[in-house]
Amino acid sequence: MAIAISPLDLLLDTENPRFVILQSREQADIRKYLVTYEDVCQLATDINTYGRLLPGERIVALHEDDKYVVVEGNRRTCSLQMLLNRELIPDGFAHRIPHTSASILTNCSNIEVDILSDRNSALELMTKRHIDGVKQWKPLAKKQFFAANYKNGQGQSIHDLSRITGV
């Protein structure tokens, strides 16, 4: 099941294995950890540049005690929360989170979130994403991607390909 919800109404997962080193697992502490150690400022910049979450990158949450707890997508959720409400940005990081336009605020104010029934149902998803990981393209496939999209200047420009791929 999927619902449309504001990222501000989502809770970051206090049981996320990334946060094992945190002594306090309040939402503000989790956000500070994510911006300090998990490159969330860059992710917020990327979301701001793109204008929304990338297609296919839906957040996954559990419905627990009348709250929605993110089990997959804590970094994306944190980024969106800080883009939507600058008061949530931890001290010392405001200069690293871009100011957003009205259109981006509109695009990100309500997002589609997949809802799972219990934490056990999230285990397979988390394993595939964080332990097995997405299989990277081999070098030849990467070359083919750039060649097919550049097409001797008839397709994307080198600048556009660099912006799209980060290479």
Where are these regions (language model features)?
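Short, charged/polar connector segments at secondary-structure boundaries
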Residues: 1-101, 109-113
